[in-house]
Amino acid sequence: MKAVIFAYHDMGCVGVTALINAGYTIEAIITHPDAPSEKTFFGSVARIAAEHNIPVFVPDDVNHPLWIARIKALAPDVIFSFYYRQLLCQDILSLPTVGAFNLHGSLLPRYRGRSPLNWVLVNGEQETGVTLHRMTARADAGAILAQRSVAITLQDDALTLHRKLCEAAAGVLEKVLPAIREQRCTETPQDESIASYVGHRTPEDGRIDWGQPAATLANLVRAVTDPWPGAFSYAGGEKFIIWKAQVRPNSADAQPGTVLSIDPLVIACGSDALEVQTGQSQQGVYMQGGQLAHALGLVKGALLNPRPLVSHKRRTRVLILGVNGFIGNHLTERLLRDGNYEIYGLDIGTDAISRFMVNPLFHFVEGDISIHSEWIEYHIKKCDIVLPLVAIATPIEYTRNPLRVFELDFEENLKIIRHCVKYQKRIIFPSTSEVYGMCTDPVFDEDDSSLIVGPINKQRWIYSVSKQLLDRVLWAYGEKEGLRFTLFRPFNWMGPRLDNLNAARIGSSRAITQLILNLVEGSHIKLVDGGAQKRCFTDISDGIEALFRIIENKDNNCDGQIINIGNPDNEASIRQLAELLLASFERHPLRQHFPPFAGFRDVESSSYYGKGYQDVEHRKPSIRNAKRLLGWAPSVPMAQTIDETLDFFLQTVDLPDAAQ
C-alpha cells in the first residue's frame, strides 16, 4: 500500500518507523524545518527518511495547488499525519483511496487542538492517551480507529508523559497498521457531546499567578518544565524559572507570593504553599531551590510577583469610532465594567452612551469621521487598539444610497486602516456575514468558504463587496507590513438599542426593530418574499463577550485571524422571527396600550427594497474559530433575546400617564 506521510517531532519518527516496519511503501515524507527559536530535543523525521532513501520535502504551504498536484501525482492509497503542524485541506484529504489518518496525543474527543500533552498536565488529569482517527475538514473530529490510554502520575512531567505517549503510539500503530492495509478496520464516530478544545500554548502561559492553589501551580510547573520554556515569576525586577516543585501544606495567613522559608524555598499560594525544588534565574544556571533563593537575594517575608515591579501597567486605550452605535455602546459598557480599559469614542449622537458620560475612563467627542480626520489620526496614534465601527449596515440603504455606502463603509474606513499601518496600531475590524453572499456551503467557514456575490446590476452587493475588499486589504497589510489585525464577522446580532424606532419609520433599520415598530403602530408586518430567508440570530451579550475576548487577545492568538461570531443553534426564518416576536408582544404587560395586530403581509423584495436587491436564503456560521481561539460559545436562546429587545423598545414609547 502506497503512503504519503506528513510528520514531525518524536511522534513523527514513531509513525514513520511503524509504517516502515509494517511494510508500507512510503512515496514521500513531508515535514518541517527545525525552527531556530525552538529547543530541539526530539528526533528528526528527515534523518529517518534519508537513511531509508525516502524522498523528503519541506513546503512552506503544503495546501498550495502546486503541492496538491505533486501529492496527487504520487497516487497515494493512504495518507498519515503524525504531529504535522499544518492543517491539510480537503483537496489533499480526498486524494487517497483508502483515507487519511491522523495520530493525536489525547483520548479524543477530549482535548482536540494544539498542545494536549501540556494541557492535560495543567488541568491535573490522571489519564490521557493517543488516538488514531480518520481526518476530516474539522481538526481532530473524524471517526476513531484505535486508542490507547496512558496513566498520569504525580511524578510525571511533560517530558516523561511525552515519552509514555510515544510508546503508546508505537503500540497502537503496530496493532492497527496491518488492519488499515487490509482494509478491515472498524471506525467509531466521536461523541460530540463530550468534545473539548484547547489552543496553542506560548511561553507567556508559564507566568505564575500566586493567587492560584499550590496544586494548580505544581501542575503548571510540570506541564511546562524543561525542555519547554518553564513556569516563571519575578523577584523584584528579576525573572526566575521554576523547573520542579511540590505542594506543601500551609495554614499560615500569608499573602500569596510571600516567601515562607528560604531553604527549602517555600512560597505561599492561594491555598497551601509551593516548595521550589529546582529552578534558575534568568542569567543563571539550573540549581536547587535554596541556592536559587540566595542567588535572587530573597529573605523570609519577601513578596514575589507575576510581573517585574519596575513595569507599571497602564490601562489599555481603546478608540471606538461609532461608539454610540449598537455594538459600540454595548462594548463600551463591557470594557468599562472590566476596569482595565480607557475608552475614547467618536460618534454623531449620544442617546445610547449618555449613561457613560460621568465615567472618568470614558472620553467622548461628538463628530463625523468624514470631517474629524485630524482628531481620528491623533487618537489612533494615542491609543493601543482601534475599532472602526462606523458603517451603513441596513439592507435598504444598499440599493437606496449605494454610493454613500461605498464612501462611508469603504473609503473612510480605508483611511483608518492606513493610519493603523502608519502608527503600527492593532485594529479589530468589523467584517460582516454579508461577505459570504450567496455561498452554498451549509455553514460558512472563515477560512474555506467562497465569497459569492451577484451581478453588477444588483447594487445591494456594494456593501458586501466593500467590506470584503477591506478584509482583503487588512490581510495584505498584515502579511506585507506586519499590521496586527483581527476580523470579526457578526451574524445577526440582536438586543436592546439595535437601531431605534425613528430609524425604522423611514425603513432604515434591521429586521427586528422594523417588526417592533409595526406592532407598536398597528401596521402590517411586511414579510419580504414571504419571510422564508433563514438567519442565525445572536444575542448582543453573547456577541459582545466574544468581541471582548478578541480585545483581550490572550496569547495574541487572535492576531491575523478571521472569527465568525454567531449562534448556529438560533436559526430561524424571518417569518418565524416575526411570529415569536408577535407572541412575546401579546403577553407583554404593556400590550393593552398598543393597537390590535394588523396581520402579516407578503411583499416582493423589489417593491420593498427597490431595484437592484437580491436576497440570501440562508446564512449559518461555523464558530469553530471562536471556540478554538476564544474559548467562546453562545448561550442565550433566541426567545430570551426577543423578549428583552421588545421590552426595551416598548419602554421607550411615550404612553399615557396611567400606563407609565
From Swiss-Prot:
Q: Which GO terms describe its molecular function?
A: carboxy-lyase activity; UDP-4-amino-4-deoxy-L-arabinose formyltransferase activity; UDP-glucuronate dehydrogenase activity
What are its GO biological-process terms? Answer: lipid A biosynthetic process; lipopolysaccharide biosynthetic process; response to antibiotic
Q: Where does the record place the region Dehydrogenase ArnADH? A: 314-660
Keywords recorded for this protein, A-Z = Antibiotic resistance, Lipid A biosynthesis, Lipid biosynthesis, Lipid metabolism, Lipopolysaccharide biosynthesis, Multifunctional enzyme, NAD, Oxidoreductase, Transferase
User: Domain of life here?
Assistant: Bacteria
Instruction: State its Enzyme Commission number(s).
Output: 2.1.2.13, 1.1.1.305
SUPFAM superfamilies in the record: FMT C-terminal domain-like, Formyltransferase, NAD(P)-binding Rossmann-fold domains
Q: Catalytic center at which residues?
A: H104, E434, R619
Free-text function comment from the UniProt entry: Bifunctional enzyme that catalyzes the oxidative decarboxylation of UDP-glucuronic acid (UDP-GlcUA) to UDP-4-keto-arabinose (UDP-Ara4O) and the addition of a formyl group to UDP-4-amino-4-deoxy-L-arabinose (UDP-L-Ara4N) to form UDP-L-4-formamido-arabinose (UDP-L-Ara4FN). The modified arabinose is attached to lipid A and is required for resistance to polymyxin and cationic antimicrobial peptides.
- Which protein is depicted? Bifunctional polymyxin resistance protein ArnA
Tell me the lineage of the source organism: Bacteria, Pseudomonadati, Pseudomonadota, Gammaproteobacteria, Enterobacterales
